[in-house]
């Protein structure tokens, strides 16, 4: 975890867990591959495209700002 604040992946995981859904369910809701969600949450893809983040935000029912804030 960054000392500066939460990463996009950490924020995605936080909101996903609040909803009580798995990475698989989120990937289907966002129409993305499972490994895309897994890699972002794990930090292996620290800078996903804005389109990917928009899809995830919509699937989680949160704003883009909620996911990119630190």
What are these regions (language model features)?
Residues 1-18:
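A short, Lys/Arg-rich alpha-helix, primarily the initiator
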Residues 15, 49-50:
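Short, Lys/Arg-enriched C-terminal cap helix and immediately downstream tail that follows
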Residues 17, 28, 58:
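Alpha-helical residues within the helix-turn-helix
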Residues 21-40:
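Short alpha-helical DNA-recognition segment
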Residues 39, 43, 55:
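Alpha-helical DNA-recognition elements
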Residues 51-66:
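DNA major-groove recognition helix of helix-turn-helix/homeodomain DNA-binding modules
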């Amino acid at each position: 975890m960054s000392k500066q604040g939460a990463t996009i992946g950490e924020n995605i995981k936080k909101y996903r867990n609040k909803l009580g859904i798995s990475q698989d369910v989120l990937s289907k809701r966002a129409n993305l591959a499972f490994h895309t969600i897994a890699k972002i949450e794990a930090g292996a893809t620290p800078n996903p495209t804005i389109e990917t983040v928009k899809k995830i935000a919509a699937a989680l029912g949160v704003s883009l700002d909620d996911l990119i804030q630190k």
